[in-house]
UniProtKB/Swiss-Prot annotation:
Enzyme class: oxidoreductase
InterPro entries in the cross-refs: GTP-CH-I_C/QueF, NADPH_dep_7-cyano-7-deazaG_red, QueF, QueF_N, QueF_type2
Active site (record annotation): C188 (thioimide intermediate), D195 (proton donor)
Catalytic activity: 7-aminomethyl-7-carbaguanine + 2 NADP(+) = 7-cyano-7-deazaguanine + 2 NADPH + 3 H(+)
E.C. numbers: 1.7.1.13
Organism listed in the record: Aliivibrio salmonicida (strain LFI1238) (Vibrio salmonicida (strain LFI1238))
Localization (cell): Cytoplasm
Gene responsible for this protein: queF
Assembly, per entry: Homodimer.
Protein name in UniProt: NADPH-dependent 7-cyano-7-deazaguanine reductase
Matching Pfam families: QueF, QueF_N
Coiled coil spans: none
Gene Ontology BP term (one): tRNA modification
MF terms (GO), sorted A to Z: preQ1 synthase activity
Length: 281
């Protein structure tokens, strides 16, 4: 359990509560969670040790055109890591559902509405693009870059989070290495529902022991935090224990409620070069 599980800022969230689905546009459904909750726990100050963003995919986006004809689209949202708030995912789903029986004059009107409302919730301007389903169907399914570290012949007997797996985990050999794992699993901070993800770690520096890194990632298995918070924890722990010259951590989570969240944190890159789906997405 994280130190901020019972924070006042979390008590009013619709997450974990029985809720009524709205069918007409209602921006007030969006709920913000201060990023400071997790960052204070990580002892991060105003000068963040990373840049990056949260990339959301909206698979259940529908509204009515001026003739009442339903429209459907798939949306991409890029939320800056510098925003004071993250958007709580259940409230995001409820907000999108409120579009279902609402008439919009154009696709551009939908896009501008999403940008306006999400920017207010996040506290910083977000980027939004929506795509016809036919156009999005051309996007390939890919694997993460680099070497997969999952197929190691090791015994795992602990699933409690422990950053100390990374202690003394580097050698003197200097490398520029890309690693990934599909074994990332954590639990929702509020509901304890499992969150399934894959994570890619791209770094330059002293070589990180693959076994210790995998044990560290597996230790998230019973850990309760939001997706974005887990990725920031991974980034800060690797920086603390391994001290790479450069580091990028990119996780892609499976969708829930028609949304997937893909947090990206880097020492030098604002956003991922490509936003491509994995097999489980």
């Amino acid at each position: 359990m994280t130190k901020y599980t019972n924070a006042d800022e979390l008590k009013s969230l619709t997450l974990g509560q029985k809720t009524e689905y709205k069918h007409s546009y209602e921006p007030e459904l969006l709920q913000a969670v201060p990023r400071s909750l997790n960052r204070d726990d990580l002892a991060l100050g105003d000068e963040l040790p990373f840049v990056g963003c949260d990339v959301w995919t909206l698979y259940e986006l529908s509204w009515l055109n001026q003739n009442g004809l339903p429209q459907v689209a798939i949306g991409d949202v890029v939320l800056p890591a510098t925003s004071p708030n993250l958007v709580e995912s259940k409230s995001f789903k409820l907000y999108l559902n409120s579009f279902n029986q609402t008439k919009f004059s154009s696709w551009e009107d939908v896009t501008s509405t999403l940008i306006k409302d999400l920017s207010v919730c996040a506290g910083e301007e977000v980027m939004v693009n929506i795509h016809p389903v036919q156009a999005y169907s051309q996007q390939p399914i890919v694997d993460m870059q680099g070497e997969c570290i999952d197929n190691q012949d090791i015994v795992i007997d602990s699933y409690e989070f422990d950053a100390n797996y990374l202690e003394s985990s580097t050698s003197e050999k200097m490398v520029n290495e890309v690693l990934h794992s599909h074994l990332l699993k954590s639990n929702c901070l509020i509901t304890n529902q499992p969150d399934w993800g894959s994570v890619e770690i791209n770094y330059e520096g002293n070589k990180i022991d693959h076994e210790k890194l995998l044990r560290y990632l597996i230790s998230f298995r019973q850990h309760n935090e939001f997706h974005e918070q887990c990725v920031e924890r991974i980034y800060t722990d690797i920086m603390k224990f391994c001290s790479p010259k450069s580091l990028t951590v990119f996780a892609r989570y499976t969708r829930r409620g028609g949304l997937d969240i893909n947090p990206f944190r880097s020492s030098h890159l604002i956003k991922p070069e490509h936003n491509l789906r994995l097999a489980r997405q």
